[in-house]
């Protein structure tokens, strides 16, 4: 979804659902994608996914709601204090509105939604960032993913997968960023 490859959506969306991704998880993944790959990409995916859900008999009642209880911060975003400090120091001086939406919408809402396990949300985010060539923020999100239980092997597989769907250049950028994170962890930093 990060690259808006709409012609491939029906095949891959069905494959994901046939492989055990639940309709609720997929719906939540599309919502999450909107924040990292842009709303137009998510809207395109949602249209295709609605058709697939209709074919499979998935009802709106089967999908996550806005009113769901939220996960505690220490579970959803274990590095939230560091994240908030970074946003206050580096984003707020340029855009208080972006700080507001980042804190109150992205983190206080989206990252706390229970329809995706925190480790799965973190892995999806690093996959999106890799496919979009967003290597500047990749280390922060990768560190969170590793903290939430994503393994280095899973990261390696995701990076290899990214090469085919996001392009080799983006996958290599993300691999270099991942190596830096791994090296820092190995050094005890």
Language-model segment annotations:
Residues 1-5, 18-19:
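Alpha-helix C-terminal capping segments
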Residues 5-9, 132-138, 164, 168-172:
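Short loop/beta submotifs within extracellular cysteine-rich repeat domains
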Residues 10, 14-18, 41-119, 139-148, ...:
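Acidic, glycine/proline-rich low-complexity segments that act as flexible tails and inter-domain linkers
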Residues 139, 148, 153-162:
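Extended hydrophobic/aromatic segments used for targeting, binding, or gating
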């Amino acid at each position: 979804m990060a690259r808006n490859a709409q012609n491939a959506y029906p095949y891959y969306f069905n494959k994901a659902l046939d492989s055990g991704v639940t309709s609720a998880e997929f719906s939540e993944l599309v919502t999450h994608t909107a924040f990292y790959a842009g709303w137009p990409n998510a809207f395109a995916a949602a249209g295709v996914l609605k058709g697939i859900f209709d074919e499979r008999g998935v009802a709106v009642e089967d999908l996550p709601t806005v009113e769901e209880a939220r996960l505690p911060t220490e579970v959803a975003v274990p590095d939230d204090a560091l994240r908030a400090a970074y946003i206050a120091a580096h984003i707020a001086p340029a855009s208080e509105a972006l700080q507001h939406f980042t804190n109150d919408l992205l983190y206080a809402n989206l990252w706390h939604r229970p329809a995706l396990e925190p480790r799965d949300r973190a892995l999806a985010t690093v996959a999106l960032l890799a496919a979009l060539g967003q290597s500047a923020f990749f280390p922060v999100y990768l560190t969170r993913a590793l903290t939430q239980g994503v393994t280095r092997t899973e990261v390696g597989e995701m990076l290899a997968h990214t090469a085919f769907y996001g392009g080799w250049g983006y996958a290599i950028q993300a691999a270099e960023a991942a190596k830096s994170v791994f090296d820092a962890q190995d050094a005890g930093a």
